[in-house]
Regions:
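Conserved phosphate/anionic-ligand binding catalytic regions in large, soluble enzymes, centered on
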Residues: 25-40
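C-terminal amphipathic alpha-helical interaction region
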Residues: 136-227
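Short, hydrophobic/aliphatic alpha-helical segments
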Residues: 11-28
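Short, solvent-exposed coil/turn linker segments
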Residues: 17, 47-51, 64, 210, ...
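Extended hydrophobic/Leu-rich segments
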Residues: 8-9, 33, 223-226
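Single conserved hydrophobic/aromatic residue that forms the stacking wall/gate
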Residues: 1-4, 8-9
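C-terminal catalytic subdomain
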Residues: 40-164
């Protein structure tokens, strides 16, 4: 098939610009991985495949993938949906026990490159924040608090030592607003060219809301509240 400047050969696409397809991969493959991992782990789910098949976490992954991230890309929707389905098939691979903890190394830099652009674009296009992606950020922040899960499993974040020190200092305040504001203000350390994320309308308040909910109700109940 010929589509504009593209030529499709079965599952291959020859195009004069690889940028949209690289963005598609980063957004729809890497992006969901980054947020599903802390959400799943803090909900007691350790394997990516099990997360996809979980009655609550599976819906969360689908929401982030199809309702949020996919809406920020500029390729044909039918093509994006087909790619999204192929990603879910990959996540569901019965022969690979992909531990979510293996994905969570350096979660903040990953969120900055894979998910934050989607948060900003979604807000621009829809006039509201993508709840699933923001909850994913709150889950990362909570994961970096450390400690143990409800089942006693250890929570052992790994990242740049300066980021680890910042989160330790912020969580020591016991104030979720200070935690959220401090993380979102860490432009030089985490967010780079995106600047101080407290300037994004509504983001600080929503992160605080989710942090409070995770602390009081637990991760799984918080996920259910946005579905």
């Amino acid at each position: 098939c010929l589509v504009g400047s593209e030529m499709c050969i079965r599952d291959r696409i020859i195009t004069d610009s690889e940028a949209p397809y690289h963005e598609r991969k980063v957004t729809l493959l890497n992006g969901p991985h980054t947020v599903l991992s802390p959400v799943s782990y803090l909900s007691g789910v350790d394997i990516v495949r099990d997360a996809c098949n979980h009655p609550v976490i599976g819906k969360y992954i689908h929401k982030v993938q199809f309702d949020e991230l996919m809406q920020t890309l500029n390729l044909p929707m039918d093509e994006l949906q087909a790619y999204g389905e192929s990603v879910l098939e990959r996540f569901n691979n019965p022969f690979v026990d992909h531990q979510v903890t293996s994905i969570m190394l350096n979660s903040f830099p990953k969120y900055q490159t894979r998910d934050l652009p989607g948060v900003k674009t979604y807000l621009e296009r829809k006039g509201e924040l993508p709840k699933g992606l923001v909850l994913g950020l709150a889950a990362i922040i909570t994961y970096y608090k450390g400690g143990t899960r409800a089942d006693g499993a250890p929570i052992q974040p790994k990242d740049d030592q300066k980021i680890m020190d910042l989160l330790t200092e912020l969580w020591a305040t016991g104030d979720t607003r200070k935690v959220a504001e401090g993380v979102l203000a860490a432009d030089e350390l985490i967010w780079k060219e995106h600047g101080d994320l407290n300037k994004i309308p509504g983001l600080t308040d929503l992160v605080v809301e989710y942090l409070d909910s995770i602390q009081s109700k637990g991760m799984l109940a918080t996920v259910e509240s946005i579905l």
